[in-house]
Amino acid sequence: FTTGSCAAAAAKAAAYMLLSGMEKTEITIETPKGIPYTAQITDIQRKECAVTCAVIKDGGDDPDVTTGSRIVARVSLPEEQPDSGEKRTQAEILIDGGSGVGRVTKPGLDQPVGNAAINHVPREMITKEVLEVCHLLDYQGILQVEISVPGGEELAQQTFNPRLGIVGGISILGTSGIVEPMSNQAILDT
């Protein structure tokens, strides 16, 4: 499964644990291809207003430098929930990259300059899965999701990222949610 699938699964699990107070050691998401992915959840750290957990990336037979990496999600409540005066009908999910996730420095990529290198499909997956938890647990406030990859800065040196203008880490990628071995599309998406 892609780094995007791993990020979405970790974010969903962290959101569930934060909002429910219950621990999750596995979680299932639906990939954009409609294939369910059940991920094992590791490295759970709980605080009053945040939960951090990880999913270990399994790239299958694809020679992917991220295979075996921990894709970490930290889901937190903002220090203050802004009051816009209107009642929310659903939660708002704010996504950013942390340590080991690259930042876009050149125009023409999937994300604008300055954004974390978390492509639009993984962003949509994370949002969909976290909103599903919010709906299930009747939460309509703001949640902050930060995706990080320990060792991502070093891994990025083995990718096209430095040449593409993505600095500081790897990209969180995926269009189908499934690693498609040695595909031309995977190279273009990078």
Kindly give the residue locations of the regions a language model identified.
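Glycine-rich anion/phosphate-binding loop at the beta-strand->alpha-helix junction
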Residues: 150, 154, 162-190
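Generic N-terminal targeting/processing segments that precede catalytic cores or assembly contacts
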Residues: 1-164
